[in-house]
Design a protein with these regions (language model features):
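Primarily short, surface-exposed interaction patches in extracytoplasmic proteins
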Residues: 23-56, 67-96, 110-482, 488-490, ...
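Post-BTB helical module
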Residues: 60-61
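Hydrophobic alpha-helical transmembrane segments and adjacent short intramembrane/lumenal linkers
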Residues: 170, 583-584
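Positively charged n-region of N-terminal signal peptides that target proteins for export
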Residues: 1-4
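Bacterial N-terminal signal peptides
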Residues: 6-17
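Active-site beta-strand/loop architecture of penicillin-binding DD-peptidases
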Residues: 596, 600-620
């Protein structure tokens, strides 16, 4: 504990070369300063975080992990007055940028991999960030789409709420505009101006959308029906025969079309330059009736032409049939949701841009302009409305570029400021943070902490030689048992999951133990976005009877275990090469299962609207870090790591190894006292490498590692 305390409370010492040269965000900083002056704020801003702290902060916020030793060394070689700009540019292009911000949008959109279309929607968002798809286009597609997830991944947003008009009305208003209208589903909003009729008018945009399931493939998709399911007045206010379909309307304030605002003019000019590239891409194909008529006409024209002509007729007819847009007929577009998507994402809808600006500002700076971040109402005004509106208007003028928004914020003084000193007065701390003159303490997000441990421990690749670490583990297997003909077979083939004595003794059992609660299923975003063409199957099914479809479905089902056979489970020894490597937490099925590392450190379940990540500490978190496999594997020293070479051979340099270890794990160099303490830890180990593993374990478990500078 003494060594752990030294790590947690050790003083920070930096070479003079690691100076503070903040990047200039221009007008944003000036507008924020002017707004603070108008509010009568006279407090002195905290100094910018030092260069090493900035490199750690910006890498976590842009790439979703701590920087590697090589990255830090490269950063320090850049000229002091350029390194922050260069670092931001570097990590904006890092492949981790899309991974990290996909998790941000997964929280916002409540993406759940275990729900229909969830994994495809996550892949869609990841691709949108990678390509810098305009944010309004990304959202417009999600609101208006119909189809199945394999072909139209953005449909996951509608499927996430089971195509329920009431749930989608609440989600659309709160997720995309920060308007909590759900309360008005049952009664007029008690704290805001929205009425029950307003709620139903928004729900009516989704009233014709229905969820269906293919009888054979069990594929779930959405399409449109003729009549709306949303009726007015509500069921509890009128007789059934007095209700009629509700007329859709958009009750939210809107900038008047006659207003010619400068930021909208800039947007129009920017989009005009892009129109030529997009021209012709939106033309729809011929309808089913048109193509069938054309195919029939060609057949009639050539019937008298003999065998060769008949073959040509057949070939051309098949070619024409293949062009039929079966999906357009099956997955009908929603005119109502097309209209709603344009209204929600319009540049003249201030709620839309303001909300995303508020979300991203809160995520990066630590405090939102509006809190809670998705609760915009007259009685909950923004703390700095001019600064928020400046960012929102510039975001729109830059064609809703999400990358532009992130870069603008991380380049600002507000983002780059350090924390208030630990011994400062609490009221002063709160005032500085509310005025964005200091940044609040932020713990790493769960995924960032996971990937940072993997990065610090060199676990994205193997770090031991093949066969170097044989290990015997207990694996649970299921064994069939032939039933006794004199007794009924009551086994159903289920795995026995009662804790075994071996589990209780702490041995590693592959089936289920807390020791392995850090891993999960890895998602392949590219494969998820590769549409599978099932048009031929759909076309053939149209000619089949219901009985034929059911017979085909039963034939395609996997064979079930013999219900008359009993199964027992047993533990067997298995020798493995204990040389693991870990994949990124951002590529896991999400949310992770309950009890997983990510869930313990704040990843939400994404079930309810407005569900935030929590950053509270808990005993389970501490136990996961102290005893979990991820921390254990990261602490182990492998011969393929740089620090191994520093500690072995004819001339080991333990002082250099300690400095490098601090450099990699905490993104700083240790003080002389810390070096002395660290060498004592190394000397106390069974051998030097075990002692270094102890030191790395201590550093990974200290508060300094978990909290951002």
């Amino acid at each position: 504990m003494k060594r752990l305390a030294v790590c947690i409370f050790a003083s920070w010492m930096f070479p003079a070369a690691w100076c503070c040269t903040p990047v200039d965000a221009g007008d944003l900083d000036a507008i924020l300063a002017a707004e603070n002056a108008e509010k009568g704020v006279t407090l002195q801003a905290v100094d910018p975080v030092d260069d090493m702290g900035f490199s750690r902060r910006v890498c976590l916020d842009l790439a979703g992990r701590i920087p590697t030793g090589k990255e830090i060394s490269q950063y320090l070689k850049w000229p002091a007055d350029q390194r922050r700009d260069k670092l931001i540019a570097k990590y904006m292009q890092d492949e981790g940028f899309a991974n990290r911000w996909s998790a941000f949008f997964a929280d916002m959109l409540r993406i759940r991999s275990n729900e229909e279309g969830g994994t495809q929607l996550l892949a869609y968002v990841h691709n949108a960030i990678t390509t810098d798809m305009p944010y309004d286009e990304m959202c417009r597609r999600m609101i208006s789409a119909n189809g199945k997830a394999g072909r139209t991944p953005e449909i996951g947003f509608v499927l996430g709420d089971d195509a329920d008009p009431m749930a989608l009305a609440s989600a659309t208003a709160q997720v995309f505009m920060g308007i909590r209208i759900s309360c008005a589903q049952c009664h007029d909003h008690p704290f805001d101006k929205w009425t029950r009729e307003d709620f139903y008018s928004v729900a009516a945009y989704f009233g014709k959308t229905i969820r269906r399931e293919n009888n054979l493939t069990k594929t779930v998709y959405t399409t449109e029906q003729d009549k709306s399911m949303v009726l007015w007045p509500p069921e509890d206010e009128s007789e059934p025969d007095a209700r009629s379909p509700m007329k859709p309307s958009f009750p939210f304030p809107y900038l008047d079309e006659s207003e010619r605002l400068e930021f909208l003019t800039r947007l129009e000019k920017l989009r005009a330059n892009k129109e030529a590239e997009a021209a012709g891409n939106s033309e729809s194909g011929p309808s089913v009736d048109d193509l069938l008529a054309a195919a029939g006409s060609k057949t009639k024209q050539r019937l008298s032409g003999g065998f060769g002509a008949a073959m040509k007729v057949s070939t051309e007819a098949k070619s024409d049939i293949r062009k039929i847009d079966v999906n357009a007929e099956l997955y009908k577009r929603s005119q109502l949701r097309d209209e709603l998507s344009r209204l929600v994402t319009s540049p003249r809808n201030r709620y839309f841009a303001r909300l995303l600006v508020n979300r991203v500002w809160k995520d990066l700076v630590g405090t939102g302009f509006v809190e809670p971040i998705d609760d915009f109402r007259d009685s909950n005004p923004a703390s700095h409305p001019k600064t928020m509106d400046y960012l929102a208007e510039e975001f729109v003028a830059n064609d809703f570029s999400f990358r532009w928004l992130v870069k603008e914020i991380v380049s600002s003084d507000a983002y780059q400021r350090a924390h208030v000193a630990l011994d400062a007065d609490e009221q002063e701390r709160a005032a500085l943070e509310q005025a964005f003159l200091a940044t609040p303490m932020r713990r790493m997000k769960a995924e960032a902490m996971y990937d940072s441990i993997v990065t610090a421990g060199h676990l994205f690749a193997v770090k031991h030689l093949p066969g170097e670490n044989p290990r015997v583990i207990k694996r649970r297997i299921r064994v069939p048992v032939d039933p006794d003909p004199n007794e009924s077979a009551d086994g159903d083939g289920a795995m026995e999951d009662e804790p075994t004595e071996e589990m209780m003794q702490g041995e590693m059992v592959a089936s289920a133990v807390n020791y392995g609660l850090e891993k999960s299923i890895e998602l392949d975003f590219g494969a998820l976005l590769s549409a599978k063409d099932d048009t031929p199957m759909i076309d053939s099914m149209k000619k089949m009877t219901r009985e034929e479809i059911e017979a085909m479905r039963m034939k395609s089902m996997p064979q079930q275990n013999n219900p008359r056979r009993r199964y027992v489970s047993k533990l067997v020894d298995e020798t493995i090469d204990d040389n693991p490597k870990f994949s990124s937490a951002y590529r896991m099925a999400t949310p992770a299962p309950a009890g997983h590392f990510l869930r313990l450190f704040g990843q939400p379940s994404r079930v309810d609207l407005g569900e935030d990540r929590y950053d509270n500490s808990s005993m389970r978190q501490a136990l996961m870090m102290l005893n979990g496999r991820l921390t254990h594997e990261a602490a182990r020293v492998g011969p393929l790591e740089p620090v191994y070479k520093m500690m072995t051979g004819a001339n080991p340099d333990f002082r250099k190894a300690v400095r490098y270890t601090y450099f990699e794990i905490l993104t700083r160099l240790p003080s002389e006292d810390e070096i002395a303490e660290a060498i004592a830890v190394i000397d106390a180990g069974e051998d030097k490498l075990t002692g270094m593993a102890d030191l790395r374990w201590i550093l990974l478990n200290c508060n300094e590692f978990r909290f951002m500078p």
